[in-house]
Structures are given as C-alpha cells and as structure tokens.
C-alpha cells in the first residue's frame, strides 16, 4: 500500500470523510523515515570526480546517440523471419547489423530476431513429392454403395426430415406395411 505524507493545507480535501471512502485511510507520517545505508561521495564541490573514483575509458557522456546521429530508417524491435525467404531474411538481418553504433548506444536497439526463414524451392519439391504420392495412392478405385436418397421415386420409403437433405421437411408419412 502506498504511503501518504502530510500536505498541510490540502490535507482536509483528501480525508476519507470528504472523499466518501468506505474504508479508513492509512495513518499519515509527519516526517519521512530515514533509509538504511549511506551516500558515497564521488565528486568534489566543483563537480569533478575524486581521484579515488575509477574513471571510464569510454566517452564520459556515455554512448547516447542523438537524433541527428541516428539512421534515417530504424529497424523494428522484434523481427520474425518465419514467413520470409532465406534471401529476404539474410538481407533483413544484414540491414539490422549494418550500423553497429546504433546497436551499442545506450538508447540504441537490441532487436529480437525470431523464427527461421523458409526456402521456397524446398517447399515446391515437398509439394511435388506429396502430389505424386497422392496420385499413386488414388489408383485403386473406390466403390461407393448406393445411398437410400438415390431411390426417391419409391413411395414406401420415408423422406428425411434433416434440412441438409436438399428439401424442406414435410409431414411424415408412416410406412405402409
């Protein structure tokens, strides 16, 4: 639960009576409690680092890249290679890794590359193999027995009341015995 600090003149407006809260509020603190630990001084009064503080060999302002140093087109944060060809995926990853300064900058990118590209030539070969297999399997003739719906001329049989039978259901006639 959040802590509430005293705001003096504004305190009355936020009391539970005026806010019409149904639950009592958490009691407020008059002063902030002290934290554990201590602050380590690393600079003198002029803002210069003390001699005991280790200095970075890199740029003292960090690796921030300003707007004018960024490329015109910024790659996306998440790239999926699943629906791409191998050549397209290779050119996309090459474009992402083309600017190493942008990848190393503190405000730079860490694009997430997901999936594996597919090769359309291998897909065509797989389709041809599956087509030839289905043709070889379909050589044996399949005999379909005559369905009862084929003899619609005989009045002795009941008509189907199912709507998918191709006609609207009519009154049922009992079978003649």
UniProtKB/Swiss-Prot annotation:
Transmembrane segments: none annotated. Residues 115-124 have a biased composition (Basic and acidic residues). One of its GO terms (cellular component) is ciliary basal body. Residues 132-163 have a biased composition (Polar residues). Pfam families: CFAP126 (PF22611). The keyword Chaperone does not apply. InterPro entries: Fltp. It comes from the Eukaryota. Expressed in airway epithelial cells. The keyword Cell membrane applies. Belongs to the Flattop family. This is Protein Flattop. It comes from Homo sapiens. The lineage of its organism: Eukaryota, Metazoa, Chordata, Craniata, Vertebrata. The gene is CFAP126.
